[in-house]
Amino acid sequence: MFPTELFTFPLNMICCVIWIAAVVSLYRNCRSTSFVRFMLSPAATYFSIGLLISICIFIGLTDRRDLTDSWIFTAILFFFQTVLLFVVLRGWKKSPANIVHHKHIRWRFIMMHAGLIIALGSGFWGAPDKQIVRMKAETDKPTNETWYIDGRPSWLPYSITLKAFNILKFSDGSPESFEAKVIIDDKPVSLRVNHPYKKNLVEDIYLSSYDSAAGDDSNYCIIQIVRDPWKYGKVIGIIMLLAGVFLLFINGPEVYRHDD
């Protein structure tokens, strides 16, 4: 497995800056080398996309989600981002055949490609800083002890207490939704499935599970705490990507010519 935990902030940020600087330097100063020419070629684009799609399909078909933490998946995603960054840099040097639409074409290209690299990069470089832990919250028993998926314990700087658990049902008796009423730092909070409580800008608290055998009488529930400082980078990247797609839909495709 790739040692993701070794690259927590600020080391991941430093590595990201060094990577960007290295790619920019190679593009500006070594464009005639075989390596840079390959990275700028359609072959590199097709190869990187093919590798990424192939491993994603393999993970989906085999349910080997542990491979997302492997060296090979990390290397493929890094290679894909590197090719994409070279493409973005080259995009600044391109002009459309119809100069009237120059601004639209450039913004469209930047929004789509830079948006994709920001969204992917936030997930890739921010992975070491993302923390997902779970806790067993019991009725009237404050606790701050949590566990990572591999069983390692950790402790929150605040406590959570379960006060009540309710199951809302349809008229036929089937469950409609689940609700856990908890106390978080002396503040009453209602947790429902897919309706997390936002503790702060980077931390969300989810209702994950409960004692299904006890039903409404469940005296505990499983709570998941997700801390992701890079999530807003993903949101910004996705918004940029969608904006680029919208501009493409509005203005249609254009023909490019190389300026370099």
Residue ranges of model-derived segments:
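Solvent-exposed, non-transmembrane regions of integral membrane proteins
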Residues: 1-260
